[in-house]
């Protein structure tokens, strides 16, 4: 199926531990992201395939990138537009997961760029739980709004 690179869907997993909110974020895999931290983490997300329901795409992408099956109910967080112009539709769900045991799908990329050599890397190399303020520092800047929206829904 063809994919639109300008529209994605994703899931923001959260939990409440001793009454405190924690946010589950994913760090992109591959050599380009190895040494990058602040502003690079993300909610598990990906492109919506033609004809695919955005919520179904968000659930599929979360499962592919983490090995975890999202469970309802899903809280709609609306859409955000990232710096490069991509729109991301997002939902939140409450659950728990051991971030150290995620299993991500693989992606093939040319590395080094322009070398003609293709290698496989996990799409997500690690996940972690963060307090909301630290999550806002770690996450892609445009996606920080999703944390704000989640907190507003939970208040």
Q: What kind of region is each of these model predictions?
A:
Residues 117-133:
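Alpha-helix-centered segments that form part of catalytic cores
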Residues 2-42, 91:
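N-terminal strand-loop-strand
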Residues 18-20, 30-33, 49, 68, ...:
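Short, charged/polar surface micro-motifs in flexible loops or helix N-caps
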Residues 128, 132-155:
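Charged phosphate-binding loop/patch that engages nucleotide di/tri-phosphates or the phosphate backbone
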Residues 79-116, 128, 150:
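Active-site-adjacent beta-strand/loop module that shapes the phosphate/pyrophosphate-binding cleft
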Residues 35, 51, 138:
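Residues that scaffold the ATP/ADP-binding catalytic core of kinase and kinase-like folds
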């Amino acid at each position: 199926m063809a994919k639109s690179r300008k529209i994605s869907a994703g899931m923001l997993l959260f939990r409440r531990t001793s009454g405190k909110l924690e946010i589950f974020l994913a760090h992109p895999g591959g050599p380009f992201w190895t040494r990058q931290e602040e502003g690079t983490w993300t909610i598990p997300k990906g492109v919506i395939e033609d004809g695919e329901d955005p919520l179904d795409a968000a659930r599929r992408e979360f499962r592919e990138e983490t090995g975890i099956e999202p469970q309802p109910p899903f809280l709609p967080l609306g859409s955000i537009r990232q710096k490069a112009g991509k729109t991301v539709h997002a939902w939140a769900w409450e659950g728990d997961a051991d971030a150290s045991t995620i299993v991500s799908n693989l992606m093939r990329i040319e590395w080094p760029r322009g070398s003609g050599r293709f290698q496989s890397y996990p799409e997500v190399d690690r996940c972690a739980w963060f307090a909301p303020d630290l999550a806002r520092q770690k996450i892609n800047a445009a996606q920080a709004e999703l944390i704000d929206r989640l907190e507003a829904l939970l208040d």
